Amino acid sequence: MDSNTITSFQVDCYLWHIRKLLSMRDMCDAPFDDRLRRDQKALKGRGSTLGLDLRVATMEGKKIVEDILKSETDENLKIAIASSPAPRYITDMSIEEISREWYMLMPRQKITGGLMVKMDQAIMDKRIILKANFSVLFDQLETLVSLRAFTEDGAIVAEISPIPSMPGHSTEDVKNAIGILIGGLEWNDNSIRASENIQRFAWGIRDENGRPPLPPKQKRYMARRVESEV
C-alpha cells in the first residue's frame, strides 16, 4: 500500500476530528455540519477499503499535523492562504431535505465516475426538480455533496451521491450522472427541471425550461431506445 495514501487518510481523519469538535461546540454553520456528515461516511468507506482503524489513524494524523505545525511560520501560512482560492458552498437543499430517508418501489442504480445514481422507475408523469448541494471553485462546480430529485409535493424520487470508497469526481462526471438520471426519469414521461444553481455552475448556462442538455453519449442512448420503441 502506498505510504502517501496512508498518510493522507490519517491526516484527513485528524482534521475531521477537529471539525467535529467545532460542531460540538456550536461554532459552525449548517453547510459545515452538512459536509461533516458526508465526510464521516467517506472516511468510514476509505478506512474499510484500506483496512485501517479510524481511531488509530486519527492519532497518527495528529502526530503528523503537530510535526508540520512546529516547523510552520506565520509568513508561510499567509502566503499559502493568499495563493489558494477558497471554494464557495452552494445549497439548493435544506438540512432536512438532504438528510431525509427515502425509498424506491422499483429501484434502479448505476455507478459512473465515482458517483452513485439511484432512481425510482415507478415514478411516472410527474413534474420533477433537481436540487443539489456542492462546492464551487472558479465559478464552476468542484465537488458534489448530494443531488436529489423532488416531485412537486416534495417526495424524493432520485439521487446522485459520491461513493465514499472511490476517488473524487470531476464536473464532467457530475454532468454525465445528471444525464443518466434525466434520461431514466424522462423515459417514464416525467418532466425534469434543474435548479438555476445546477444550470449555472455545472453547464454555465440557463435554459428557460430549466432542463440541462444531455451529454452526447446519453443522447445517442436515448435515441436508440426511441427507435427500438418505434
From Swiss-Prot:
UniProt keyword annotation of Transmembrane present: no
Motif (Nuclear localization signal) on chain: 34-38
Region (RNA-binding and homodimerization) location: 1-73
Region (CPSF4-binding): 180-215
Free-text function comment from the UniProt entry: Inhibits post-transcriptional processing of cellular pre-mRNA, by binding and inhibiting two cellular proteins that are required for the 3'-end processing of cellular pre-mRNAs: the 30 kDa cleavage and polyadenylation specificity factor/CPSF4 and the poly(A)-binding protein 2/PABPN1. In turn, unprocessed 3' end pre-mRNAs accumulate in the host nucleus and are no longer exported to the cytoplasm. Cellular protein synthesis is thereby shut off very early after virus infection.
Organism ancestry: Viruses, Riboviria, Orthornavirae, Negarnaviricota, Polyploviricotina
GO molecular function ontology, one term from the record: protein serine/threonine kinase inhibitor activity
Motif stretch (Nuclear export signal): 137-146
Subunit structure: Homodimer. Interacts with host TRIM25 (via coiled coil); this interaction specifically inhibits TRIM25 multimerization and TRIM25-mediated RIGI CARD ubiquitination. Interacts with human EIF2AK2/PKR, CPSF4, IVNS1ABP and PABPN1.
Protein name as annotated: Non-structural protein 1
Locations listed in the record: Host nucleus; Host cytoplasm
Modification after translation (UniProt): Upon interferon induction, ISGylated via host HERC5; this results in the impairment of NS1 interaction with RNA targets due to its inability to form homodimers and to interact with host EIF2AK2/PKR.
UniProt entry keywords in alphabetical sequence: Eukaryotic host gene expression shutoff by virus, Host cytoplasm, Host gene expression shutoff by virus, Host mRNA suppression by virus, Host nucleus, Host-virus interaction, Inhibition of host innate immune response by virus, Inhibition of host interferon signaling pathway by virus, Inhibition of host PKR by virus, Inhibition of host pre-mRNA processing by virus, Inhibition of host RIG-I by virus, Inhibition of host RLR pathway by virus, Interferon antiviral system evasion, RNA-binding, Ubl conjugation, Viral immunoevasion
SUPFAM superfamilies (UniProt xref): Ns1 effector domain-like, S15/NS1 RNA-binding domain
A biological process term (GO) from this entry: symbiont-mediated suppression of host PKR/eIFalpha signaling
Domain notes: The dsRNA-binding region is required for suppression of RNA silencing.
HAMAP family: INFV_NS1
The keyword Ubl conjugation appears for this protein: yes
TM region(s), chain numbering: none
Cysteines engaged in disulfide bonds, as pairs: none
Family: Belongs to the influenza A viruses NS1 family.
Annotated segments matching region PABPN1-binding: 223-230
